[in-house]
Amino acid sequence: MKVWSQRLSFLIVMIFILAGLHSSSAGRKLPSMTTTEEFQRLSFDGKRILSEVTADKKYDRIYGASARLVPKGPNPLHNK
């Protein structure tokens, strides 16, 4: 019976300590962002940054890929 009373008193003391810690930190909350502020932070500005294109290079503006030169002649990998 003595062990039960010691455990019970320890449990009650721990509950009071944890409740005190919780109530003391409840007043310190970080300021939350409003939904408008969060949307503005996460929104996309709509601008695309494309690389500079010179007149001598062929460039596909839709896909943003350059037309590279393909080697002409027989492919040595297929000549086995």
Curated annotation (Swiss-Prot):
<keyword id="KW-0732">Signal</keyword>
<dbReference type="GO" id="GO:0005102">
    <property type="term" value="F:signaling receptor binding"/>
</dbReference>
<protein>
    <recommendedName>
        <fullName>CLAVATA3/ESR (CLE)-related protein 14</fullName>
    </recommendedName>
</protein>
<keyword id="KW-0379">Hydroxylation</keyword>
<feature type="glycosylation site" description="O-linked (Ara...) hydroxyproline">
    <location>
        <position position="74"/>
    </location>
</feature>
<dbReference type="GO" id="GO:0045168">
    <property type="term" value="P:cell-cell signaling involved in cell fate commitment"/>
</dbReference>
<dbReference type="GO" id="GO:0033612">
    <property type="term" value="F:receptor serine/threonine kinase binding"/>
</dbReference>
<dbReference type="GO" id="GO:0048046">
    <property type="term" value="C:apoplast"/>
</dbReference>
<dbReference type="InterPro" id="IPR055317">
    <property type="entry name" value="CLE14-like"/>
</dbReference>
<dbReference type="GO" id="GO:1900055">
    <property type="term" value="P:regulation of leaf senescence"/>
</dbReference>
<dbReference type="GO" id="GO:2000377">
    <property type="term" value="P:regulation of reactive oxygen species metabolic process"/>
</dbReference>
<keyword id="KW-0221">Differentiation</keyword>
<dbReference type="GO" id="GO:0010078">
    <property type="term" value="P:maintenance of root meristem identity"/>
</dbReference>
<keyword id="KW-0964">Secreted</keyword>
<feature type="modified residue" description="Hydroxyproline">
    <location>
        <position position="71"/>
    </location>
</feature>
<feature type="signal peptide">
    <location>
        <begin position="1"/>
        <end position="26"/>
    </location>
</feature>
<comment type="similarity">
    <text>Belongs to the CLV3/ESR signal peptide family.</text>
</comment>
<keyword id="KW-0325">Glycoprotein</keyword>
<dbReference type="GO" id="GO:0016036">
    <property type="term" value="P:cellular response to phosphate starvation"/>
</dbReference>
<dbReference type="GO" id="GO:0045595">
    <property type="term" value="P:regulation of cell differentiation"/>
</dbReference>
<feature type="modified residue" description="Hydroxyproline">
    <location>
        <position position="74"/>
    </location>
</feature>
<keyword id="KW-0217">Developmental protein</keyword>
<dbReference type="GO" id="GO:0010088">
    <property type="term" value="P:phloem development"/>
</dbReference>
